[in-house]
Structure formats: C-alpha cells, structure tokens
Amino acid sequence: MSYAIICSSKTGNTKKLAQRAREVLGEKNECSTADADLVLLGSWTDKGGLDPALEDALPQLAAKRVFLFGTCGFGGSQAYYDRVLDRFQSALPEGAQVVGRFMCQGQMPPAVRARYVTMAEQDPKRFEPMIENFDRALGHPDAADLTAFEVALRAAL
C-alpha cells in the first residue's frame, strides 16, 4: 500500500511517531500525497488543535483515506486526546475518510517547566498540577506510546 505522511513536529515528538509509521509501512512505499492510498496527517497540538502551518495541505485530503495522529503536552486522559483528535478531524475537508486516529503525550521543552515554576510562586494551586504534568510527560512518546501507535496504525490498514 502506498502512503504519504504530512507532519508538523515542533519538538520532535510527533516526528517520532511519523518515523515509526515509516518503519511499519516500509519507506519504499512512501509517495506523494496525490498518489497515496493512505495519508497520515500528524501534528503537535497547538492550542488544542492542528498546527496552523498544516492548513495549506488539507485541501488535497478531500478524497483520501486519512490516519490522524499527534502529540500533546497534556495527557493522561483518553477523553482529552479524543477531544483534540475531534478538532483535528473537523479541520479536514469534506470527503476525507478518517480510517484511524492516535494521540499520546509528548514531552515539552524545559522552558515551559521554568515558566510554570515562576507562575506557581503566585498561584501554586493552579500551576503545581501543571508542573506535575510536565514531569510525567518527560520521555514521551516512549516505547509504550510507539507500540500503541503501531497497533492503532495497523488496525487502520
């Protein structure tokens, strides 16, 4: 099966998932979006949705089978991941057929934690949970995330 990957990865987390997809699907089968049987659309989460930089690529997905994937700094809840993926999906053009979806937590840059620590001095009740989430996100996507991604991708084939 031929496939194309359209991916935006600000910190490298979503890029790790894209690389796993290449390993699963075989690099020799990757082709242009126009020629692909399946298009994998991946994004880091920007304010709860797709990276706006991907907007120009979306119209070409109108008649394509699409597998959505991404990473986000906040995690721990499939319900949250589903809401983010719903926003990703709502950005697709009419006629795009979503055949699978996957989202996992991704680690954030150290500057984010430093900002949370500073803000926690003023509002610890609000920012301590954010620091705890940051610490839980370290190392993600991890091996378990990559395995879960592979399972979701294979199920969509």
Would you name each region that the model predicts?
Residues S43:
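Conserved strand-to-loop "acid loop" that flanks and positions the catalytic carboxylate
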Residues D37-L40, R65:
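Structural motif
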Residues G12-K16:
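Short N-terminal binding/cap micro-motifs at the start of the first secondary-structure element
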Residues C7, S32-T33, P59:
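Generic structural signal for beta-strand residues in well-ordered domains
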Residues Y3, R20-K28, D46-L157:
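FMN-binding flavodoxin-like domain, especially the glycine-rich phosphate-binding loop
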Residues S2-S9:
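Terminal, regulation- and interaction-focused segments at domain boundaries
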Residues G26-D37:
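Short acidic low-complexity segments
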